[in-house]
Amino acid sequence: MTLGINLSRVIRNTSKASLVALTIGLVTTVAGVKYSLAQQKVKLLGSGASFPAPLYQRWFKDFKDVSVDYQSKGSGAGVRDFTQELVDFGASDVAMKDDEIAKVKRGVIMLPMTAGSVVLAYNVPGVSNLKLSRAVYVDIFLGKIKNWNDAKIQAINSGVNLPNLPITVVHRSDGSGTTGVFTKHLSAISPEWKSKVGEGKTVQWPTGVGGAKNDGVAAQIKQIKGGIGYIEFGFAKSAGLPTAALQNKAGKYVSASQDSVKATLAAVKLPGNLRAFISDPDGANSYPIATYTWMLMYSKYDGSKGVAIEKMVEYGLNEGQKVSAELGYIPLPNNVRQTVAAAADKISSGYQIKLK
């Protein structure tokens, strides 16, 4: 009898223990599934520059580890969204200035992720090989040269049949890092431009019509006979628009290409804060209007977001650079990749960026 009672107790206790173990196992499994799903659902929101948008959108489409929504709004809107902490990261073709950085409570890490050129695309029927001197393209955007057969344009385009066609300048209508790059260059080469118009993401244009973002300007140029405007090279390429060879600091006429923009970047040394302004580069073969373009990161994120940010940057520095040239951008030099990786690796202690 005693043995039977003990067996019953053993059975009951064993059943209870099994039930408890099963319950703990289920809870642990469910919690693990929930945690795994939570990891998979990390989403990042970014906004800003339209200049690198085709490249970034390609990266984020191909990159499967993190869901990234990048909204191409223009650098001005991107910096504003980033400063107000409405996004997880921003993007700008012009590095943030000290007074802008001071407004960001979580700190700022600026990472140059690619580079490219600002070209002067045009729509002049029958003209595919156009050269523009520094003085001429400044005067076009000042509104002083008004016609395509102007003597100053003809003088540097011997043998080109320039039509009697009004020039229509097309510029950005939104806050734009591309505008910042272009007007900084014009201010560097022309005292008149610097005093009358100046530089910035938005300026008071002396002449012309506006278009939103790089693709909007490209569309306007394509639509307007006699149009000329400044856009990132890839947008001109996609729109099938010819671009002018521009006179550089050494006096040579240079078209935008992988080699000429690499020559420009080679003449520029990035400082420790990774902020560089390329207003009028040296070098006989340098293309005169080129820029790095930056992702803007906070110094502090919560655990999952910080890891996701580092994974996104790692992808951009590795696989992302391989498709840059295909879309008209310039892959980062290896020394720049290493510097960017080291800076980005400070964002999260839970992940280490590895370059391939």
Question: Can you name each region flagged by the protein language model?
Answer:
Residues 35-356:
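Flexible loop/hinge segments at secondary-structure junctions
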Residues 16-29:
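Bacterial N-terminal signal peptides
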Residues 7, 27-28, 86:
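Assembly/oligomerization scaffold segments
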Residues 12, 30, 35-37:
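Glycine-centered signal
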Residues 1-13:
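N-terminal secretory signal peptides that target proteins for export/translocation
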